[in-house]
Amino acid sequence: MELIFLSIALAMDSVAISMANGARCMNIKALQIFKMSFLFGIFQAFMPVIGYFLGLAFVGFISYIDHYVAFAILLFLGIKMIKESRQISVHCSLNLSLRMLMLGAFATSLDALAVGITFSFEEINIAIAAFVIGLVCFVLCVIASYMGRVLGEMLESKALVLGGVILILIGCKIIITHLIN
C-alpha cells in the first residue's frame, strides 16, 4: 500500500502537465493522450531503476543538482506555455513534440530518481516497484488529460496560462523544498 501512495505522489507533477496539455489542446486525440501518458509512465518507471543502481556512489552530487535542473526545465516549459496562450487555437498542433514531452517527463521524474536512490538502501524488488510507479503514473496521466480537455473547453486560452503557472509553481515547490531541507 505504501508503494501505491508513493506512486501517486511521484505522479502528481506528470499529472499536472498532462492536465495542462489536455486543457491547452482541446482536440487532443486519444492516441496523443496515450503516447504522452506512456512516456510519462516510462520515465517514472525507469528513473527509480537508474537511481537504484546509482545508489550511494553519486548520491551527494545527484541530490545537489536535481532540484535545480527540474526547476529550470519546468520554468522554461511554464513560460513557453504562457507565451503560447496568445496563439491558442482549437486545432492545436500542440507542442506535443517528442522533445518537449521528454523534457517534461524528465523534469517531473527527477524525484523518482531520488526515490530510486533511497530504494538502494532498502530491501525492495525494484522491478515490481518500477512497474507499479510507471503504471500508476500512466493511468493518472490518462485521466488528467481527459479532465484537462474538458477544462480547456470551458476556460479556452486561460487554460494555457493556468497550465504554465502550474508548471512554474511546481518548479518553485521543488526548489523551495530543496532549500528548506
Curated annotation (Swiss-Prot):
It comes from the Bacteria. It holds the Pfam family Mntp. The chain crosses the membrane at residues 3-23, 42-62, 63-83, 101-121, 124-144, 160-180. InterPro entries: Mntp/YtaF (IPR003810), Put_MntP (IPR022929). It is found in: Cell inner membrane. GO terms for molecular function: manganese ion transmembrane transporter activity. One of its GO terms (cellular component) is plasma membrane. It is a multi-pass membrane protein. Keywords: Cell inner membrane, Cell membrane, Ion transport, Manganese, Membrane, Transmembrane, Transmembrane helix, Transport. Probably functions as a manganese efflux pump. Belongs to the MntP (TC 9.B.29) family. This is Putative manganese efflux pump MntP. The gene is mntP.
